[in-house]
């Protein structure tokens, strides 16, 4: 493996795509999720917490990006393939937590008008109405993905409603304003590690109870990014319930690195994979410390 650069507390290494990857502490890989996953050791992470790019939301201008597939079926199939490889990397008693948003059919409209204040939003796209749906239909992406993963062999164990008390208003007047997303808990095996006491809730009458499936978590903007980020308090229960200190947590769509932030706070190791080099830089700035390696996957 190439020697580490010493100009930064974060090491930057160039690897060829054919080389197998080893985990040695918290690591951030810059590269395509599926390509990196295929080179990670089997059974090496205890938990996966992630939020894939939403379908048809925006174009990040990056080759191999997810979310711009021409059909919903292609999008879902691609995610199933990625999570199938992630399952191999997961321990037999490991868990997968997936947050993904929904959307409405567009009536086959094209790109949105440019937005000078938010370039990422300027490239938001409206894919064609999926076959079998009508204009203005709620697409149902979260549940379609959950059922597709279940069909692929995952155990679908829980659907958590992420309720957003500070949800952004919408201009629509012919339906309620959306204020929630889904977070699915899936497992690789019938029996798995889950520490319910680590995430128990206080009862109004005193004492504690098992955590319920509606989580009230405010969205929080991150100043360094022009896109939505995972709230730390949405991620924390997933990690605490599914891992022990020192375990590895994987996020194959690392974004700004919030999973890594929570892992640092909770004494877990993390493995992040992020395709967009701008987001890698954002994550690096958030995670500055000698415990993090940044490995940039060479194109060759």
Swiss-Prot record:
Residues 109-129 are annotated as: Disordered. Its EC number is 2.1.1.113. InterPro entries: DNA_methylase_N4/N6, MeTrfase_CN4_CS, RM_Methyltransferase, SAM-dependent_MTases_sf. Gene3D superfamilies: Vaccinia Virus protein VP39. GO terms for molecular function: DNA binding; N-methyltransferase activity; site-specific DNA-methyltransferase (cytosine-N4-specific) activity. It catalyses: a 2'-deoxycytidine in DNA + S-adenosyl-L-methionine = an N(4)-methyl-2'-deoxycytidine in DNA + S-adenosyl-L-homocysteine + H(+). Keywords: DNA-binding, Methyltransferase, Restriction system, S-adenosyl-L-methionine, Transferase. One of its GO terms (biological process) is DNA restriction-modification system. It comes from the Bacteria. Pfam families: N6_N4_Mtase. Belongs to the N(4)/N(6)-methyltransferase family. N(4) subfamily. This is Type II methyltransferase M.Cfr9I. It comes from Citrobacter freundii.
């Amino acid at each position: 493996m190439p020697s580490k650069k010493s100009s930064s507390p974060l090491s930057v290494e160039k690897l060829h795509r054919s080389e197998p990857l080893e985990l040695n502490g918290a690591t951030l890989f810059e590269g395509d999720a599926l390509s990196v996953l295929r080179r990670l050791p089997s059974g090496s992470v205890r938990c996966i917490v992630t939020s894939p790019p939403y379908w048809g939301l925006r174009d990040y201008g990056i080759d191999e990006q997810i979310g711009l597939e021409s059909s919903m079926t292609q999008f879902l199939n691609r995610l199933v393939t990625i999570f199938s490889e992630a399952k191999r990397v997961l321990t037999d008693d490991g868990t997968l937590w997936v947050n993904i948003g929904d959307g409405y059919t567009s009536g086959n409209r094209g790109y949105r008008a440019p937005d000078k204040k938010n370039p990422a939003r300027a490239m938001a796209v409206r894919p064609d109405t999926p076959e079998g749906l009508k204009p203005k239909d709620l697409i149902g992406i979260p549940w379609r993905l959950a059922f597709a993963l279940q069909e692929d062999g995952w155990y679908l164990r829980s659907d958590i409603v992420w309720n957003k008390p500070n949800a952004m208003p919408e201009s629509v007047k012919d339906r309620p304003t959306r204020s929630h997303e889904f977070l699915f808990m899936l497992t690789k095996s019938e029996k798995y590690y889950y520490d319910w006491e680590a995430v128990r809730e206080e009862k109004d009458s005193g004492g504690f109870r098992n955590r319920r499936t509606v989580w009230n978590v405010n969205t929080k903007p991150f100043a360094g990014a022009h896109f939505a980020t995972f709230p730390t308090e949405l991620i924390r229960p997933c990690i605490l319930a599914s891992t022990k200190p020192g375990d590895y947590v994987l996020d194959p769509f690392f974004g700004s690195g919030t999973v890594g932030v929570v892992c640092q706070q909770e004494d877990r190791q993390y493995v992040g994979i992020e395709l967009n080099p701008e987001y890698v830089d954002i994550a690096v700035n958030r995670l500055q410390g000698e415990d993090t390696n940044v490995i940039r996957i060479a194109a060759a």
